[in-house]
Regions:
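Acidic, Ala/Val/Gly-enriched low-complexity intrinsically disordered segments
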Residues: 1-3
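Strand-loop microenvironment adjacent to phosphate/nucleotide-handling motifs in alpha/beta enzyme folds
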Residues: 5-238
Length: 238
């Protein structure tokens, strides 16, 4: 929180991963920062849940695919038990990983980072900088579970996105740009926009290839507006 940061106190981070090597790498990354410290580690979700029920952490770095209890199951328990520790999910760079990452946001995760493919990437600057940036953002937020509302699939009415008063919004667009924490924030905004919005909406979100498509598909399911991943030659229409 802000008081801890202003007093130069270190934020306590819990690291959860079934890979001993990745736990070690993530601990080294966190401990290299003068505002963070890796307080505890767990090798599966069940261990993590037990710790989170009894101890306080400023953020959790959580793997998805683990034995006994996976990351999505942990998030589901945290949500049901109103444990609001900010969670940063580590996701594989695959289609399945993209689905799991977007699902984790709906279950209350703050954001996600993609898992390194090998030890060279794990110890590289890109993974280190990305992980530290997201963890720093996570520990500074006020923990809320915006995804605790029921996520429903919206049935779009035929012609619902056609603007009857075309002149009113013909020269306007709504532009939204987001970075760390952005995918979760978009899930709290886009589904609440009306189908009769008088201007097209453009979203700019830095994500790995494939993840933007998955996010767009999920937002489309939840929203009255039609949402799609942009493609070359697309034309913005009211």
């Amino acid at each position: 929180d802000e008081e801890k940061w202003s007093n130069n106190m270190k934020s306590n981070i819990l690291i959860v991963d079934d890979s001993a090597l990745l736990r070690r790498v993530e601990c080294d990354i966190i401990n290299s920062d003068n505002k963070l410290q890796a307080t505890d580690t767990c090798k599966d979700g069940l261990e993590a849940l037990e710790k989170l029920r009894t101890q306080k952490y400023d953020a959790v770095i959580l793997d998805i695919n683990m034995p006994r209890m996976n990351g999505l199951e942990v998030l589901s328990h945290l949500q049901k038990e109103s444990i609001k520790t900010p969670v940063v999910v580590v996701s594989t760079l695959t289609i399945e990983g993209a689905d799991e990452a977007i699902k984790s946001l709906e279950l209350g995760a703050f954001d996600f980072v993609t898992k390194p493919n090998n030890i060279i990437e794990a110890k590289g600057n890109q993974f280190k900088e990305t992980l530290l940036r997201v963890v720093h953002a996570a520990v500074r937020i006020t923990p809320v579970h915006s995804a605790s509302r029921n996520v429903t699939v919206v049935e779009k009415k035929a012609g619902a996105i056609v603007n009857k008063n075309k002149a009113a919004g013909s020269n306007k667009i709504v532009a939204i740009a987001s970075s760390t924490g952005g995918p979760k924030a978009l899930q709290s905004v886009i589904p609440f926009l009306p189908a009769e919005l008088l201007a097209p909406v453009v979203l700019v979100q830095h994500m790995p290839e494939g993840f933007t498509k998955t996010l767009a598909m999920r937002l489309n399911e939840q929203s009255a507006l039609s949402v799609k991943e942009a493609a070359e030659g697309d034309v913005l229409k009211n």
